[in-house]
């Protein structure tokens, strides 16, 4: 008499998901996904000398104008001139700056029906924030984003800013 043993392949009962690892928080990690992969935007406020004042992280595929007001609300902007590129030319941002007794130098987009005047000589000073971002990219940990949590990534952005200020 022969005994036949049969084996069945049973699919797993547990579905493998991107569950948080031990010690990892499930909070928003400010990581966006696009065709190029995962990415994070660092929004920065700098003073007239190019020194960083405030930082904010967002998903890489979020529009810049969504995070301008939370970034500007971190400091007192009364009596100052806010420089920004065309992405920050939304009416809500301009109204926020006006309501806090500040001026803005933001060029209008090409498709705006009622463009506002821009002092292009003052607008040239916006290169200070671009220079700061180039200095920030010297740090490998920032331009590769090895950190899983946005709190630790933002902490290293602050450390890098301190190192840049001390040079």
Model-based region annotation:
Residues 1-167:
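Short alpha-helical elements
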